[in-house]
Amino acid sequence: MSYATKIHARYVYDSRGNPTVEVDFTTDKGLFRSIVPSGASTGVHEALELRDGDKSKWLGKGVLKAVANVNDIIAPALIKAKIDVVDQAKIDEFLLSLDGTPNKSKLGANAILGVSLAAANAAAAAQGIPLYKHIANISNAKKGKFVLPVPFQNVLNGGSHAGGALAFQEFMIAPTGVSTFSEALRIGSEVYHNLKSLTKKKYGQSAGNVGDEGGVAPDIKTPKEALDLIMDAIDKAGYKGKVGIAMDVASSEFYKDGKYDLDFKNPESDPSKWLSGPQLADLYEQLISEYPIVSIEDPFAEDDWDAWVHFFERVGDKIQIVGDDLTVTNPTRIKTAIEKKAANALLLKVNQIGTLTESIQAANDSYAAGWGVMVSHRSGETEDTFIADLSVGLRSGQIKTGAPARSERLAKLNQILRIEEELGSEAIYAGKDFQKASQL
């Protein structure tokens, strides 16, 4: 048995320059570390990220309370409990009972998750296996060759992530028409470089500047204009037919009075031009018919269930419809979405739920309903690569971790490259089967 002999938390900085929680978990095998990511938008149905709220330091975003909760409450209790690190479910159950609230608001999801993920790193080492193999074991993933995910790369930003009038938040490229992860990543990189030079040529030098997740953010007005630019980049790179396009609309951001305002960044926006759910669905259908769109995330607002259901009936057999704000990795919300037939894929963000065990449960519940699972980074990321191993261990077949730019994004993609090299012929690339990867 291997158990915690020392647990120590500190604050470090994320890719936005905000403090976040880092946990060192020590066992007889050494020291194992995890850093917690943070999202820009934090939904009402998410586990609570504990921030200090002291405006005189870090603009209120300090995490000293969460760090103290690890050092003063979790560490002594977990060390005393002497739980075998290999038993992730037992460790996470212990952390949940220590907190005792439904949304982890007592200790903070950022405190709990840091310990949960660091413990998983320790467990892999205790067994002398890579992290992704440990995750595959505890999630009861299908045996056989490991599946490497399609990298959904956010190459063009709009919405709340960017200036300009474009309402949709993310436009991603997904190199599905190739046979290896490394080839997919190379194609992604080449398309991205072509996109950057086209963007600068068309919109001026500063349009090549990158956003929080590495994508360009030119002053684009409409989704069509964005998609045309990406298609030009794919063509120019020479990969037409090999690269699909995905969008994260993040439509909750522009949902007002039951309508969708595609001009939401304009304070003088004309309410007579706002779209109803069915009208927005018409726009999506038009785009799907004109472009190689394989996946749309959050096409409607998180509580506009009717619009989701109506849209799923129309295109659910053609493309992947991903719930993020809709489901927030929350088992109850996922269950409702499955029952209502509102979507067919889950966006999995470990810090929305707060422990590894609950993240695995969310993925397995989704698989059981025939859904796909896309493992996702957050906009405030770090050099931590846990989600790369998570995506491989869960057989998710798809990962969303930004553009091939900025080290905190590349860290995950580079880790999957290493895993691909290590597995050799024991790995297959999800490719066009990304939505059904758990069954491959």
From Swiss-Prot:
Homodimer. Pathway: Carbohydrate degradation; glycolysis; pyruvate from D-glyceraldehyde 3-phosphate: step 4/5. One of its GO terms (molecular function) is magnesium ion binding. InterPro entries: Enolase, Enolase-like_C_sf, Enolase-like_N, Enolase_C, Enolase_CS, Enolase_N. It comes from Candida albicans (strain SC5314 / ATCC MYA-2876). It is found in: Cytoplasm. Its EC number is 4.2.1.11. The active site is at E213 (proton donor), K349 (proton acceptor). This is Enolase 1. Mg(2+) binds at D248, E297, D324. One of its GO terms (biological process) is fungal-type cell wall organization or biogenesis. Its cofactor is Mg(2+). Belongs to the enolase family. The keyword Zinc does not apply. Pfam families: Enolase_C, Enolase_N. Coiled coil: none annotated. Mg(2+) is required for catalysis and for stabilizing the dimer. One of its GO terms (cellular component) is cell surface. SUPFAM superfamilies: Enolase C-terminal domain-like, Enolase N-terminal domain-like.
